[in-house]
Amino acid sequence: MFDKYDVIVVGAGHAGCEAAAAAANMGSKVLLATMNMNTIAQMSCNPAMGGIAKGQIVREIDAMGGYSGIVSDKSMIQFRMLNKSKGPAMWSPRTQNDRMRFAEEWRLMLEQNKNVDFWQEMITGIVVKDGRACGIRTGMGIEIEGKSVVLTNGTFLNGLIHIGEKKFGGGRAGERAAKGITEQLEGLGFESGRMKTGTPPRLDGRTINYDKTEEQEGDGDIRGFSYKNIELPATQRPCHITFTNQAVHDVLKTGFDRSPMFNGRIRGSGPRYCPSIEDKIERFSDRDRHQLFIEPEGWNTVEIYINGFSSSLPEDVQYKALRLIPGFENVKMFRPGYAIEYDYFPPTQLELSLETKLVKGLFFAGQINGTTGYEEAASQGMIAGINAHNLVKEEEPFVMKRSEGYIGVLVDDLINKGTKEPYRMFTSRAEFRLLLRQDNADIRLTEIAHKMGLASDERHQTLLAKKESMESIQQFIRNLSVTPDEINGFLGNIESAPLKQKVKLDKILARPKVGIENLSEVIPVLKDFVSTYSEQWIESAEVEMKYEGYIQKEREVVEKMNRLENIKLRDDLDFDKLSSLSAEAVEKLKQIRPKTLGQASRISGVSPSDVSILMVAMGR
């Protein structure tokens, strides 16, 4: 009935879909197992992709040949580039998406891949023989053989949904929890924990008075995540902004005694940076209002996602409070918000390839590793899919460095530091933000992915054309001289110091408030030259030139870090015998077993003096 698969992926959320796509596109025969074929790639929470640091991750997935960027672009209903008022290291693309079309596009792309098969059933266990994963066991008792297994169970492992004093098993509203896998893994020696996340109520957009809210349009310059030429929408749907008030807070407080968060019924750790509305009121009691975003769920639906109002309070309290919000006086609720508790496995139990240390051929990706967010999950899925394929084909694991991508930062943080609360990516977590911009993910990663057989020849050719174009633009600007007569009027308008003699144009470009776009308006020859190039390629060329000195400094730091990465630690190194190491360092080093001195230096509890001791032990 079943072939023997190279890779079996359990769970078809964002992590599972990217894992299946990556392994299949590299040539593995893949089975994607899900409890419900109709919920493949479902956006369980907000109908949006990207955002601060997350947008960079989606672009990195796309640069590697993953599908999240393409699907996001095809299902986009609004685009915004966040943080444009800050430097380019902080610019982060974000899309509002049609929830239904997003899932449809993902399923269509997977179904068009001849290397992907599907099976709909609850998976209750992994078949493990001689310390190696070699298949899965279904609820009907069927065993399906596989050379590797990727677990991407999301919030389904012993999921428990809370609404006020009510609680019931489920992995998502209206769907069953997954039973059996946690218990088996614990029996194999894995440590597990509990985490919690939440979602807001869904509202009927026909009952909202938008005149009492603030409209938030998308950017006029619509862009996408994908480096491929995806057709983008000609129009956009606006979001809206409203605020809570003291009356709303007072009503919400009446339900605190029935809140599972406050009465101790929820044991799992919740996301620090995405608190529920009741948590915000409790923690920030000095605030008399909190901002809410009214987000449409798609082109052809009236359903509204109310971002910022996540709650597990009783449904009657949620409803009463909503009706006190400006614009919501007559609002109807489609379903209440809820909190969900689920099992996760501390990610320090993984290798940097996302393969488990205890069971060969078993990989974890997504919320099972303690992360939160579609983008974080999708990126882990891609890494796990790549490495499951590499394991089966007896190739070296792929490990993205911290200096190569936000995905590298994410995985490195998880494995070396672990997490006791849902981990979310921020730009502040990356030490090389100027190197890891959203505009250059293809320059950083597409060549690597092409060599692995993941990024297509078409992507590679586009990358080569972009690099050549950027070099041409930069060379033209470096060679072009401008006189005081040509440029001083422009400089005066932007309150920049006038020229006293002729200079090369790159010296002017380095100044604040100066860009290729506004320079083109006063230098016709520049305007003619750049008119033949892509706007985004021009922007990348400009950023590289304007921030050249800072970028070079970051590259020098990366070089120093890479020297530590190149010092391998012996697999048989006995940390107990290094008596000068601190007790905490010995404990952490034994737990994580770092492969390199660089990795050891980033482990929480390992000090610079401990690193020096390791260097001596390695004969350096």
What does each model-identified segment do?
Residues V127-E143:
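Conserved beta-strand-loop-beta-strand element in the redox core of flavoprotein oxidoreductases
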Residues R429, L435, T446-S612, V616-R620:
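Extended, charge-enriched "interface" segments that sit outside catalytic cores
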